């Protein structure tokens, strides 16, 4: 009797039919498998070379492209691994890509991935709420890739003569002096 009590304390994924929503676990796994269609974003050659040494991004994309084994626990583990990889992205951004537009898109990805993780941990899994998050994560990744392209495009625009002087004269924050405001 004690052995059975100890054995039942383990946290196992219980595969029961989702009778509330009328869907079996086999059907749920088929739905998850059909929605897991992550693809690496298309890059220009300039972006590809700029991101070539960013190991965390490449590992995350490679991990997403591989479908998990056909079990709920495999999907849960895959999304949990994805969360860990996403957390390291802002700290490891390559030089030149550390701007607010890219960071905000990474933060959006950091919002959608934990929500997907939470939904996959529920029992029964609310598949109608879960499935849209696969598309949202793919859109977030595409949006980040588009921002990479925009950064490279802006960097390649040549500066015209006198443009730097205009920027400096217009930028009042740079011209402001600490002692300019009188103190009384």
Predicted feature residues:
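C-terminal amphipathic alpha-helix
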Residues: 27-43, 47, 124-184
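Charged, amphipathic alpha-helical oligomerization/scaffolding segments
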Residues: 52, 56-59, 81-84, 88, ...
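Short, charged, amphipathic alpha-helical segments
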Residues: 76-80, 100-107, 128-136
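Amphipathic, soluble alpha-helical interaction motifs
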Residues: 63, 85-88, 92, 119, ...
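Short, solvent-exposed, charged loop/turn and helix-capping segments
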Residues: 88-103, 120-127
